[in-house]
Amino acid sequence: MNLRFVFKLVGRVELMVAASLLLPLAVALFYGESPWHFVLTMGLILCVCAPLARMPAQPVFFQREGFVIVGLIWVVTCLFGSLPFWFSGCFASFVDCLFEASSGFTTTGATILPDIEALPQGIQFWRCFTHWLGGMGVLVLATAVFPSLGARSQYLTRAETPGPMVVKLVPKQAKTSKILYGIYCAMTLAVIALLWGAGMPLYDAAVHAFSIAGTGGFSSRNASFAAYPLPGVDLIVATATLLFSLNFGLFFLALRRRFREIWRSEELRFFLAVVALATVLIAWDLDPVYHQGALESLRYAFFHVTSVISTSGFFTEDYALWPQFSQMVLVLLMFCGSCSSSTGGGIKCARVLILLRILRREVRRIAHPRCVEVIKMDGRVVESSTIRGTLVFLGCYMLILLAAGLIISLDGYSFSISFSSALASLSNVGPGLELVGPTGNFSLLSPLSKVTMSLCMVTGRLEIFPILVLFSRAVWRHT
């Protein structure tokens, strides 16, 4: 284990986090607020991480170091990111600050705040900006900024990129990262322009665009997008969250005008089919409730289906009050999640597709024991290592979900609250059901449950293994 390089890279990335605090600091100054919570945080990060970043180390690392670097950076980033909240005095405890920061960077969108609008503008901006930073991944940004990492940077992006397979658009990983971030920035600016053009104030358009881009769910308003009864806003948000839920490699193909290759993506077709089916089912279930016609029911359904499957967690209605069938459909979407190599969370549609094809193959083997059938996606054979990794991931996911739900249930709340809290944090969705639904918050949970959920958020965002590696004795044995 090349520990010197591990700590050096952690230090360099955290200095980037410190630099990102300049934006909320400028917002605080613009609105005449105290900037000292940002200044203190930047100073502390500089004192701790500047010596690490200057540490002499050989840039030699492999998959083991890659997973350790990713796990450490995300844990340390959440800790440092919680300091502006703590220094601002707006939060009751450091555990609450850690919960909010973890929810921000992992793009979960769960909150412990009963009154978001009481926060200073600078803190609100930082809260939503953490979604944007965490959406594409801090290590993907680091790879774009530090091309000196060379070919070995694939170990970092492999550990951080969501999904069973890693997107590589061009031979050099650093150039791939730059392309991805270029697309990410362009789409974010487009969302800001659209929301501003639809009638939102520029500040609100910006902070909500950060949340939409990261498929996070934080808002500057207590009522989320229900506070903006402007024509077209919900359609802009639903369409944008849908786009950010897609594999970013598809946007690269679109820029190259390779549209046939885009439609060949089986994950894309599966994802769109799930969205369409869920929208129709929920609209059919809601029609007798709202009595506003099929179009209004489809509008409500489409917004919340895209919000949940993208793991954004925005809302215009309290779906915790919807019929049980609609709530069950949304819970299933929480499991499914978005596409691989997107900013969304969940299990990912590619894994669901692989699992369905494994099930189909096993059923056929029962009928035809000598049958030899390979699993394919997009016309290519899925490697056995990918199949094994998918099954191990799903097994770990369910075990962590059950363990987290068990710990949260110690607070004495209902099964729906305990289970949906665990699922919402592990899948990075944000809101759960009942008291922790869209119009509620997680302040009622105990510190143990909040820490458990914070750990689940990071574990779910990194897709389990980089966090498990940190607790593996075998990884640290030969340091």
Predicted segments with their positions:
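Membrane-proximal intracellular helices of multi-pass ion channels
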Residues: 1-479
